[in-house]
Amino acid sequence: MTTFQFLKSVTADKSNLLERLLKLLHDNNIRYCVIGGVAVSAYAEPVISLDVDLVVTNYQLGRFESLLANTFLIKRTPRLIEITAANSRLRANVHTDSRLADFMERAEIRNVMDMQLPVACIEDVLRAQVWQFEDGTRKRS
């Protein structure tokens, strides 16, 4: 069993949420990078989570959000767009904090759970965690 197959099993993702979201990003040339626990998987042993955290470029955020509305269930908060789908326990969290915008400039394509994805550099992954902790927005594990 591959890491990706294991993720699909753990998240009971029968809706292919992650694949559909990544296709939407790719097909619409929306720049993004992975942050959070899944990004850590690019630098260490795989971390399996029910959340995939992303950052999308600020100037494409409005268009991206309108594209999501036709395909996914969306919950918007001041700093986050939570994307879910029926038949999946997986959540994609698009962080909208403007401090994260520069992360894409330093992101590199890396192997994450058997997928080649743009991943924030390790310093930015840590920086995002520190900011979320300081702001009180970090999810409790």
Model-derived features: positions:
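Compositionally biased terminal segments of proteins
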Residues: 1-141
